[in-house]
Amino acid sequence: MTRHSRSATVKLRRGRRSDLDALVALEHALFDSQFFAGHLIARASFRRLLASPGATFLVAEAGKQIGAQIGIQVGAQVGAYVLVLYRANSGAARIYSIGVAARFRRRGLARSLVAAAEKDAVRRGRKAMRLEVRADDRGTIALYESSGYRRIGRAPGYYNGRVDALRLEKVLGKEPRRDL
């Protein structure tokens, strides 16, 4: 999937081993290592997860567009990612981590990555997508709720014993019912 946004072309694709340095740098730039202690993905874990059949990495690769008709990108870089985990014998997938570099925010990348992750989960036979989000992160909560996620619980002190997490879930494969 390719999107054009503010003079940049954004391509969603599966993560590759060659993305390892960019993914590690993005994870550590986005998440405070003291606040998110125990939740940050280490380099070795990224490497293992990129090769794991129980995980899907999707990345948004952004670059300058040249030749609009032929769609060539130059200077492409990983601007965002989502990591989805799949447990055997579970009907649900889990968004474990999602991040968008500051300079690529407000372009719909997170929403596009979540939608692509949901499609992948449906393709793998999952009936629901679950995740945790900081209870004080109103913007991210609004993104998920506007995408059909609902609150199913709260985890006190989930983030380093200091901030609660909300547990969210979306039933996949069905359009939400709209009352007339």
Question: Model features per residue range: what roles?
Answer:
Residues 152-155:
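Beta-hairpin "wing" of winged helix-turn-helix
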Residues 3, 14-105, 111-116, 120-124, ...:
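Acetyl-CoA-dependent GNAT
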Residues 57, 127-130, 134-141, 147, ...:
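C-terminal "cap" of GNAT-fold acetyltransferases
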Residues 21, 141-142:
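Alpha-helical elements of the RecA-like P-loop NTPase motor core of helicases
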